[in-house]
Amino acid sequence: MPGPRVWGKYLWRSPHSKGCPGAMWWLLLWGVLQACPTRGSVLLAQELPQQLTSPGYPEPYGKGQESSTDIKAPEGFAVRLVFQDFDLEPSQDCAGDSVTISFVGSDPSQFCGQQGSPLGRPPGQREFVSSGRSLRLTFRTQPSSENKTAHLHKGFLALYQTVAVNYSQPISEASRGSEAINAPGDNPAKVQNHCQEPYYQAAAAGALTCATPGTWKDRQDGEEVLQCMPVCGRPVTPIAQNQTTLGSSRAKLGNFPWQAFTSIHGRGGGALLGDRWILTAAHTIYPKDSVSLRKNQSVNVFLGHTAIDEMLKLGNHPVHRVVVHPDYRQNESHNFSGDIALLELQHSIPLGPNVLPVCLPDNETLYRSGLLGYVSGFGMEMGWLTTELKYSRLPVAPREACNAWLQKRQRPEVFSDNMFCVGDETQRHSVCQGDSGSVYVVWDNHAHHWVATGIVSWGIGCGEGYDFYTKVLSYVDWIKGVMNGKN
């Protein structure tokens, strides 16, 4: 508030060798290499995406090594691979460190460098889908006379999974699963499509036939594409709602799977909407009290854990664009109207028990006075920055009580209808600097899911009186418009 890594099951080391063989014939054969000989492994792709990384990622990779990984899919399926992070030392024609993707029916593709580097050839957002049921990734680094970690290149992180044969349309899809049900001689192949519950639900389901490349048909021969939509507001490990005490507690993994940790001008929070949007406060992007803002400030987003160090290990989710509500005025220090923003991520995020979106509100009853909700965040606590996700159970406060509290203190802050207040004047609470942008959630008894009704916006001091939140309901149409590409 202002002023106010599941790793894929793989091994890089060959099961036949625990170190560098000392035999002279091997040294003669591989004398050109400085390190261990080629290491190989075989991975079995599954419906859900799994991670494959360079050795030691995200720490800088060592020099003078070669690793080949064969990724195989079950009969009737292909392998899809896409890079989420790629950082190799650039070189002309990728003659130095490189990653090579190869499979039957296609020429090998070699990559190096980083996105935007003038030298090198990074893969960018390209996805690789094997023509058969296997794909090979080869990672090579050139020998070096320098310290093997004396460079700043961390390697790569890729996601791989199975897709149906003749797959031709991009998926974000952690979401879609396919189960082959064709018998010998069947043509075309029939695939029972389904969504990965409980993280996704189907908008169109059933047995679809892969008739032509990129076309699915149902039993009535009508074209239909399975749409898997993220399930919001239903944690696999929900918070225990029977607690009676107010105040701060440490969150368990999976309690608040929508929680994001942001680092822009400082630490902040946010909440996942769908599988590629972060809901946050505008003032975390354009602070009210900042005199010398740097242009092109980096926006870092982390998800998937309750410990900051573990979130950092999982890696930053690059942001494609930032959308701030037009009503937000950075130069009006006492007016936080329109304190809401959306961050669109470059890639959709595979959902799972520790990464799930929160729902949006749809009615005023979710704001009634006395309704208890939860606010979570990585903000300061007792003057110290926390490294663990904390949460507090707090009631929605009467609007008139908050107005009176502000007037008593002769505060100039605007308390508009697009805001609401939370807390109890007689109780201490823990919302403070670093919590900005995190959300206040309540349980919707009718829809049976958690709803983000508020965004931590502003307050007077820490742990005292009331805190003031952006009323998300007032901005639902704007949020949906941005997410649907209308705004």
Curated annotation (Swiss-Prot):
Gene Ontology BP term (one): complement activation, classical pathway
Top-level class of the enzyme under EC nomenclature: hydrolase
Entry keyword set: Complement pathway, Disulfide bond, Glycoprotein, Hydrolase, Immunity, Innate immunity, Protease, Secreted, Serine protease, Signal, Sushi
Residue span, Sushi domain: 165-230
Family in the record: Belongs to the peptidase S1 family.
SMART domains per record: CUB, Tryp_SPc
GO CC terms of this entry: blood microparticle; extracellular exosome; extracellular space
Glycan-linked positions: N147, N166, N242, N296, N363
Inducing stimuli: Up-regulated in monocytes and dendritic cells (DC) undergoing maturation or activation.
Tissue: Highly expressed in placenta, liver, kidney, pancreas, moderately in lung, spleen, prostate, ovary, colon, and PBL, and weakly in heart, skeletal muscle, thymus, testis, and small intestine.
Recorded GO MF terms: serine-type endopeptidase activity
Peptidase S1 domain residues: 245-484
Domain of life: Eukaryota
Identification of the protein by name: Complement C1r subcomponent-like protein
Protein task: Mediates the proteolytic cleavage of HP/haptoglobin in the endoplasmic reticulum.
Record-annotated CUB domain positions: 39-163
Gene name linked to the record: C1RL
Annotated organism of origin: Homo sapiens (Human)
Subcellular location: Secreted
Coiled coil location: none
Assigned EC number: 3.4.21.-
